[in-house]
């Protein structure tokens, strides 16, 4: 241990104790401070500053992680937290902040914390909550988990300097979640929420981890929108998605009502560009609205299995073909009726007819996507037999082949069995369920 202290000469408060604990807690073949020191020597360079040296030490521990010695990932996390804690302490010292109440007051003044926390809780209650904090629970983090949490979820000032520890983050979330409980038991709920989160008995979705306790406290993850077949409606849906993504939500967008490529616009034949061009707009919005750089937006786009643009839709994320018809950052999903699978089971060489929803609405006076089950099947076959409606006829096996090819290359499309979902819908009196969201991947 003496040699280690000399060779790892980094001016970080608590580092010596951290190394001693690593040496004590991680023993056995493949562990030990001598191994860490040996790897650190290979990374150390003359003239390294303290920050670079600490990063090299963390990297040394992280790269020792293997199938045979998995616990090095926890050792790396301890070193990562040691460096982070020093950075936070330095920031707070410069601001003259002592204690959790002063910290929350400062963060509220800076617009980094929601003022509702101080409105709901007294100083005494926040000081009581501060007593719940248990830094020993930081030892439960793996390096990858802690590194992600420190980069994305703890509160930073406007210059990206951290001002909150992971345990304070969990406590802040707990204060938010419990604030509407009755006063006589509210602090018990704060303690209960904090214990469950900090012991990693439960976890929260990204919007809750990121937004609870902050001014824009949007906690929901999943949203759904039906994209109308109009210019105004399409852009309104894209704007809705941008607003949802801005605060951490993901969205499922149903494009089954949008007219297909070559369809009429104001009576002019062949004017419509189809759904792919609009989906590219959603794709670019997901990339652009990246939640203050925290993470890229997420959208699943849904199209019916009978839509004329299905073949191009199934190739949205594949690596071959015209890149102008690609959308690599969204998650395509297909809404399948039972009829498709029944026909595929009977004979894959059968024809499957693709049609434009706008054309069906114009000719037949109803929206095929607005029904399911036997009524949908009856109307679909009626449309197939109507010569006034143009069809794009493909073989079932070609559709299945495109699905398999895309699934192998990209893991998509997600499969949404619309008849099964709508039969199970307890609120069918409120209308049809057109699609789901990103959760369809489960």
What are these regions (language model features)?
Residues 1-442:
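Extended catalytic cores of very large enzyme megasubunits
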């Amino acid at each position: 241990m003496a040699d280690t202290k000399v060779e790892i000469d980094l001016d970080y408060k608590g580092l010596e104790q951290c190394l001693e604990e690593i040496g004590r807690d991680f023993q056995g073949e493949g562990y030990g401070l001598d191994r860490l020191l040996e790897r650190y020597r290979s990374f150390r360079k003359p003239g390294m500053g303290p920050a670079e040296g600490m990063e090299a030490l963390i990297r040394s521990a992280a790269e020792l992680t293997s199938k045979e010695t998995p616990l090095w990932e926890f050792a790396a996390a301890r070193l990562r937290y040691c460096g982070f804690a020093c950075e936070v302490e330095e920031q707070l010292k410069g601001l003259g902040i002592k204690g959790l109440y002063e910290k929350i007051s400062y963060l509220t003044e800076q617009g980094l914390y929601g003022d509702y926390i101080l409105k709901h809780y007294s100083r005494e209650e926040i000081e009581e909550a501060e007593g719940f904090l248990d830094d020993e629970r930081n030892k439960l983090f793996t390096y990858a988990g802690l590194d992600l949490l420190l980069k994305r979820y703890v509160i930073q000032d406007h210059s990206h300097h951290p001002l909150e520890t992971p345990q304070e983050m969990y406590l802040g979330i707990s204060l938010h979640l419990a604030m509407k409980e009755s006063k006589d038991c509210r602090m018990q709920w704060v303690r209960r929420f904090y214990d469950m989160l900090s012991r990693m008995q439960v976890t929260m979705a990204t919007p809750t981890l990121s937004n609870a306790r902050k001014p824009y406290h949007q906690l929901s993850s999943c949203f759904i929108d039906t994209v109308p077949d109009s210019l105004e409606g399409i852009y309104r849906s894209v704007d809705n998605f941008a607003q949802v993504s801005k605060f951490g939500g993901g969205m499922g967008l149903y494009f089954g009502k949008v007219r297909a490529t070559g369809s009429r616009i104001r009576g002019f034949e062949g004017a419509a560009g189809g759904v792919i061009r609009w989906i590219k707009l959603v794709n670019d919005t997901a990339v652009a609205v990246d939640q203050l750089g925290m993470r890229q937006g997420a959208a699943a786009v849904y199209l019916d299995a009978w839509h004329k643009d299905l073949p191009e839709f199934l190739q949205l994320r594949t690596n071959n073909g015209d890149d102008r018809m690609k959308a690599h950052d969204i998650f395509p999903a297909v809404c399948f009726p039972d009829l498709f699978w029944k026909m595929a089971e009977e004979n894959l060489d059968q024809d499957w007819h693709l049609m434009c929803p706008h054309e069906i609405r114009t000719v037949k006076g109803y929206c095929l996507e607005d029904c399911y089950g036997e009524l949908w099947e009856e109307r679909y076959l009626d449309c197939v037999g109507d010569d006034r409606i143009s069809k794009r006829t493909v073989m079932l096996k070609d559709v299945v082949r495109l699905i398999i090819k895309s699934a192998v290359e990209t893991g998509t499309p997600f499969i949404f069995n619309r008849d099964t979902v709508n039969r199970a819908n307890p609120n069918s009196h409120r209308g049809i369920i057109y699609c789901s969201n990103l959760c369809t991947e489960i």
